[in-house]
């Protein structure tokens, strides 16, 4: 729970606050809520610095509590360390970021996580993510989301679908950059939608 709370607050702080290094976290970030509150509770926004203090405390505590084994759809020690490394980087603690990343890589390698090959990369994004799956590849943590889960407009898949909100698209400039090398494996996971696909005519 600590790792997921830290991850959630990290995402909210990035979304609603300036980067920490902009003003050493002095500006407003997200609201920190660590207790169960009443439905009419109106939390005040904390500073970015306060948010990062909470995020780091949560993630550092979680690293010592989480298990090391792979568990599909569940966060483990290596995923928490990876996330902590990213938080340290955003916080400007480069040495801590490097040390956490090294610890995550070494631990993951000991537990048979392996980087995808170029041949595996295009299909890895559509691998089975059900709880029964034992496939992990280089995935440290992922959300279990099946085609049968909440197929309506509030589902995760609808956010990225060309027929939905289309929030997961790459920019044209980035796509053109990738096309400079026709062997770039990332081109194989991009679905180029036409305007007709992307917009409803109704």
Can you name each region flagged by the protein language model?
Residues 98-202:
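Hydrophobic-face positions in mid-chain alpha helices that act as interaction patches
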